[in-house]
């Protein structure tokens, strides 16, 4: 099926995928006066007395802004904010369909980090949460950090943390299959951009002890010249021994390969050099770092990709709707490390022991158990971490 042509037709016919629906029927003078003037003055005054009343008298508690500057749209590159609109509309559809969250696309005509931070800060009083989307690395790290520091609502860059959470969920179940402990395995993360960086830190937070990072120039090591600051930080944290080499060197004896890089980078010889029952998440799109059947023929036990036409799809829609659902319900001020880990464990837990096998380590996006499990886990973790307004 030609999804490109089908999608063009859909978008042309609908002229957009979202709309605003009124929750109030205004059919007479009384209902008009209640929903708008003069009645609306009463909740307005209550909010002016206490800003927290915005969660009582408005829809703010269920609203998320999906913000993008279009600098890293899917695998298409820097096409600008206007071109990002179909993607952001689609993201809003997923928020509603999979999480019951009302979301609005905010596509920006600037790629200046200071301007983006200021715009989002000034818009934030209208929303209960901010989802950053398709903002290029390493700018995305600074933008998210500054917004998290300066706002008291959740700020979540899905390209980073959504992917990291699903990878952790998949890895939890994959390690069960191969009967290995995350504290003991050697993990290679290839492609330390937005997703790869977040994956690495989350795996470390979950207990991983041995992580090697590599990019197109080879293994990251502290004394390497001309590295972006976030790569230097990763190298100094995870490669204190200053180990050097290429991807082939990195994967020798590894138990887990996580690719968020480019297609066809992982060869059969590399897979054969890994430990027995290797786990491979080859998430480059549209062409994975290695195709699942090729990886398995070379000895891999569990293989996941970013594609829906292969088993074990690493799909962010398993995470972000339920995460925001739980965070909004808890009136959380932040999305913490523990909330992310709780979400990953909840996603992994949807797959029962009876269902778990090498081709079924992650639930499907349409599994209704996912939203319930993730939102509850995130809600409970937010309360435990003390980041709620409740």
Describe the residue ranges of each PLM region.
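Rossmann-like adenosine-cofactor binding region
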Residues: 232-301, 308-309
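N-terminal ligand-binding/catalytic initiation module
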Residues: 1-155, 375, 381-389
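Adenosine-phosphate binding glycine-rich loop
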Residues: 154, 158-159, 282-390
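Glycine-rich phosphate/diphosphate-binding loop of Rossmann-like nucleotide-binding domains
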Residues: 74, 79-99, 151, 157, ...
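General beta-strand structural signal in soluble alpha/beta enzymes
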Residues: 105, 131-134, 155-158, 189, ...
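Short, ordered loop/turn segments at secondary-structure junctions
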Residues: 69-71, 79, 108-109, 134-137, ...
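Solvent-exposed alpha-helices and their adjacent loops that cap or buttress functional pockets
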Residues: 55-60, 96-97, 122-124, 148-149, ...
């Amino acid at each position: 099926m030609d999804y490109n042509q089908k999608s063009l037709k859909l978008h042309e016919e609908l002229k957009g995928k979202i709309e605003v629906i009124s929750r109030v029927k205004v059919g007479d003078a009384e209902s008009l006066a209640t929903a708008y003037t003069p009645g609306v003055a009463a909740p307005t005054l209550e909010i002016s007395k206490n800003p927290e009343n915005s969660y009582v008298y408005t829809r703010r508690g269920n609203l998320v802004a999906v913000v993008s500057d279009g600098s890293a749209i899917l695998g298409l590159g820097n096409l600008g904010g206007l071109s990002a609109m179909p993607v952001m509309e689609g993201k809003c559809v997923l928020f509603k369909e999979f999480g019951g969250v009302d979301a609005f696309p905010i596509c920006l005509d600037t790629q200046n980090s200071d301007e983006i931070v200021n715009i989002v800060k000034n818009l934030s009083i209208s929303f209960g949460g901010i989802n950053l989307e398709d903002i290029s690395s390493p700018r995305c790290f600074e933008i998210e950090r500054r917004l998290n520091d300066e706002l008291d609502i959740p700020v979540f860059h899905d390209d980073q943390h959504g992917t990291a959470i699903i990878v952790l969920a998949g890895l939890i179940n994959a390690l069960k299959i191969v009967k290995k402990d995350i504290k003991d395995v050697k993990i290679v993360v290839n492609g330390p951009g937005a997703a790869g960086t977040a994956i690495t830190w989350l795996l470390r937070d979950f207990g991983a002890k041995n992580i090697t990072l590599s990019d197109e120039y080879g293994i990251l090591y502290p004394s390497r010249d001309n590295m972006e600051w976030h790569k230097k930080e990763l190298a100094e944290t995870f490669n204190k021994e200053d180990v050097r080499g290429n991807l082939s060197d990195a994967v020798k004896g590894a138990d887990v390969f996580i690719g968020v890089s480019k297609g066809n980078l992982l060869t059969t010889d590399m897979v054969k050099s890994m430990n027995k029952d290797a786990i491979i998440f080859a998430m480059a799109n549209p062409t994975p770092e290695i195709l699942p059947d090729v990886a398995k023929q070379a000895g891999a036990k569990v293989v996941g990709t970013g594609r829906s036409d292969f088993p074990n799809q690493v799909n962010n829609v398993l995470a972000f709707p339920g995460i925001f659902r739980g965070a909004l319900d808890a009136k959380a001020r932040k999305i913490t490390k523990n909330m992310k880990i709780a979400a990953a464990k909840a996603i992994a837990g949807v797959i029962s022991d009876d269902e778990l096998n090498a081709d079924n380590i992650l639930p499907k996006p349409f599994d209704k158990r996912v939203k319930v499990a993730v939102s509850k886990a995130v809600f409970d973790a937010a309360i435990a971490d003390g980041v709620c307004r409740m």
